[in-house]
């Protein structure tokens, strides 16, 4: 169903290429996961190009739980422990403790403050002491291997920003409908058309990555 609805946007490879081009230009992309999984669409931006206006959109148009996807080595470098010792969530979403920048924020809730926190966390020289805990940004630890290991939005985000040649850090939030329900693919496609954002799926990223591996092989 998802693939047929997305057929007008080209092949899986073409959809991923459109997403990578958007990220390189500092724009957002919409990624839908498998229909038999969450079947939700996330709005994703590269962390290094994230603007206050884009954060405001994430807060306004999405669930408000803005997450910062980071690879395992960055999570370890920042000494961010898992949110809980035993993760019993349905899909094993790897939340760490929430964070706040220690410098340059007020309450930490505003769009500008959340961007400041994200920029502090992704800085090349970032230290654990640069971040207070808890806060209003929710880091997610991506599994090594990306979507070929786990078909989640966290891994899809890291795969996309890396494939785009950007720093391995991305920001995501689940898109919601005006009535507060979760947006599914038809609504995600309409949202993408309204905001001129490409739409792709986790399966598309899997296909793209496997095609790259086949070329190497």
Curated annotation (Swiss-Prot):
One of its GO terms (cellular component) is cytosol. Keywords: Lyase, Magnesium, Manganese, Metal-binding, Riboflavin biosynthesis. Mg(2+) 2 binds at residues 38, 153. It holds the Pfam family DHBP_synthase. Gene3D superfamilies: DHBP synthase (3.90.870.10). Binds 2 divalent metal cations per subunit. Magnesium or manganese. Mg(2+) 1 binds at residue 38. Pathway: Cofactor biosynthesis; riboflavin biosynthesis; 2-hydroxy-3-oxobutyl phosphate from D-ribulose 5-phosphate: step 1/1. Homodimer. Belongs to the DHBP synthase family. PANTHER family: 3,4-DIHYDROXY-2-BUTANONE 4-PHOSPHATE SYNTHASE, GTP CYCLOHYDROLASE II-RELATED. This is 3,4-dihydroxy-2-butanone 4-phosphate synthase. The lineage of its organism: Bacteria, Pseudomonadati, Pseudomonadota, Gammaproteobacteria, Alteromonadales.
